[in-house]
Structures are given as C-alpha cells and as structure tokens.
Design a protein with these regions (language model features):
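C-terminal motif of bacterial Sec signal peptides marking the signal peptidase cleavage site
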Residues: 15-17
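An acidic-aromatic substrate-binding cleft motif
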Residues: 197-216
C-alpha cells in the first residue's frame, strides 16, 4: 500500500517566506517481528538525534538495534577505470529525523576531478524474509521465524526516519573509463530538519587499469 507524505513547512517569525519540502510516495515497511529487548531500549536512550557511521558493505544490519559495528570515520574504496564500486554507511537516530537527504560532493585528487554525478547514495528499505539457514532448500516452514532484513535499494531522494531506528545507505560510484589514476576525496553530507549535518568522508582510489565495456 502506498503512503503519501508531505513535509510541513514551519512558518517562522521575521522570515520573508519558506520552501515547502517535496511530496513523495513510498510504502510502509512491516513491523519488526523480533521484539526489542530492554537492553536495546536502554542503548537507544543514549543515542541523540541523527548519527552516521561507515559499515561493511558485506553485512546486514537490524533496523531496530543501535549499530554495534566498530564504525569508521573514513571509507576508502578502490576500483579500475570503468568499474562500479560500492560502500555502505548507517544512519541511526534515537529521536527520529524528518526530511533526511544525502548529497555527494565532487571527487578531487591532487591534479584531477570527477563529477558527483558518477555517485549515488540511496536509502535501503526493509522487507520481511526467512531466517537464513544453509541447510534449508525448501519452502518456508510455518515454524521458521520471520525476520526484517535490509533488501531494497530505493530511489527516494528524501526519507523520514522513525525514532529508535537504523537506516542503511548504499553508496555507488561509477568510475569513468577515462578517469586519471589516483586517490580522490569526496564527502557525503546528510541533512535533516532540526538535526544539523552529518558528514561522511569518502575516498576512491582509481587504479591504472581499464575494465572493458560489455560491447568489448
């Protein structure tokens, strides 16, 4: 079922006007079938408004738990010219965050530059699934517990985060085939209404090798 949300624009005194946040369509995610423990609730009580940490792109993270991964302040990925490389960071909030937006800056090395258009930072959505079992190759048993797992990479440009939730953000960088080799620095700025800004430094090392196109 689709849900339409409209961010309200607060009218502040002594202002000439205000910008209305865009309307967007999205779906309502399922409730987490796994009950939140008292320990988790206590951990959320220590979390402020909006936080961000880099995390492994090879791991899945619960929507209902405070991230326990040893978060990194800087993410560095590498790839050939023409290669698509990815990374993941986690946003989490104890109080909720309205109108979360991620903006990628240009990539700059010592003597070259790549446009921010080569990159995207997209919100990961959660869906219900079966708990993974390496021995299960059949339909789900009625006794098999369901889990809420990160699954869909959405195209939404703006997102509302509920209180006490974690939201993965999937970062993709398409390295141009004509890129100059070197280490490029960028930054993803995450902003939300009343939450300030969260800055996620990102470095991409372009290796002096060319990945052939599918035509080749």
């Amino acid at each position: 079922m689709k849900l339409t949300r409209l961010f309200a624009c607060a009218v502040l005194p002594f202002m000439f006007g205000c910008n209305t946040a865009p309307e967007f369509n999205t779906f309502t995610e399922a409730d987490d079938p796994v009950a939140v423990t008292e320990k988790s609730l206590l951990a959320w009580n220590q979390v402020g408004r909006l936080n961000g940490i880099w995390a492994s792109a090879d791991s899945l993270y619960s929507r209902s738990e405070v991230p326990v991964t040893p978060g990194q302040k800087l993410c560095r990925i590498e790839g050939w010219k023409g290669e698509r490389v990815s990374a993941q960071f986690l946003l989490y909030t104890g109080t909720g965050a309205e109108g979360v937006v991620c903006k990628v800056s240009d990539f700059a090395s010592a003597d070259s530059r790549m446009s921010s258009d080569i990159a995207s930072a997209r919100f990961v959505r959660y869906t219900l699934g079966d708990q993974a079992s390496p021995t299960c190759r059949c339909d789900r048993s009625p006794y098999s517990p369901a889990i809420l797992a990160p699954d869909l990479i959405d195209t939404l440009k703006v997102f509302n985060m509920d209180a006490r939730t974690t939201r993965p953000v999937w970062v993709t960088v398409n390295i141009p085939q004509d890129a100059e080799p070197g280490v490029y620095k960028s930054e993803i700025t995450v902003s939300a209404k009343g939450c300030g800004k969260v800055r996620m430094p990102l470095e991409v090392e372009v290796i002096d090798q060319v990945l052939p196109t599918h035509e080749d």
